[in-house]
Amino acid sequence: MIGDAMSEPTFATLVSRWYERSARDLPWRKPGIGAWAILVSEVMLQQTPVVRVVPAWEAWLARWPEPRALAEDTPAEAIRMWGRLGYPRRAVRLRECAVAIVERHGGVVPDRLDHLLALPGVGTYTARAVAAFAYGQRHPVVDTNVRRVVSRAIAGEPDAGPTTRPADLVATEELLPIEPAAAALASAAFMELGAVVCTARAPRCAICPVESSCAWRASGQAAPTGPTRRPQRYAGTDRQVRGLLLAVLRESTGPVPHRRLDQVWHDDVQRARALAGLVTDGLVEPVGEESFRLAGDGPPSPSPLPHLPHPPHHQR
């Protein structure tokens, strides 16, 4: 897979040197940042732009600088602190992860890959990222950006194509230096290259550290053929309604009456569906039959099910 003009140490070395000169100055990359801070950053960066994550990450770590601090707080406070980062289920899972770290590992983020994978909400990518970036281990860390870099520079293809996790991991691992610390640096460098230079639609090939040996450039740089990503519609969706409901609940210091939530959105059926989804996802819980609150924001409620409005007769 790797041609004579681009052996694995040459590729990794070139990209790593570029990274050390040109990488973005992000707070979770600073020397001395611990595994918990890196884990939090990786969870927040899933589906959320860096510019929005930085202030949220700093505020989160200021409040909960270690897993035990978060584990001792409530799910409701985690949801409040998550604010408008989006996909707030991540906040609940991050707290569950903190609880597991305290119970299973004495409050220290584990360094073994299998132990990381066993934590709630931690998947293959996040586990490998923490093992590499926090503990300097040799693991291929593969996201969309890395897949695109490998596809273009090594295979000469403009698009990475469908995800094939085992093959992607193997292809990326072949590029890593043998020495663990150098491999961890290369993993971060590959990711950064795909994020800021080898981008999906407007690659900056002129400043790429491997431009001269890139298989895609050598083959004539065929245009990407994959589907163009369209921005997901937000206005009028259940996601918007969920966000509006959560905003009211986050700002409340106690249970919120159902009638107050009824004012959030005009469509009774959609509002009821969104509220039921928040309950199912463990973000919101009923208090009695006519009020709701953020999960864990008070003593257990005797009522296990929310009281949801019936749809209008013409919509049944």
Identify what each model region corresponds to.
Residues 279-292:
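A short, conserved structural fragment
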Residues 219, 289, 297:
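Surface loops and adjacent helix of pleckstrin homology
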Residues 14, 18-242, 248-259, 264-269:
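Catalytic cores of DNA base-excision repair glycosylases
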Residues 98, 294-299:
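Short beta-strand-to-coil "C-cap" segments at the C-terminal boundary of structured domains/repeats
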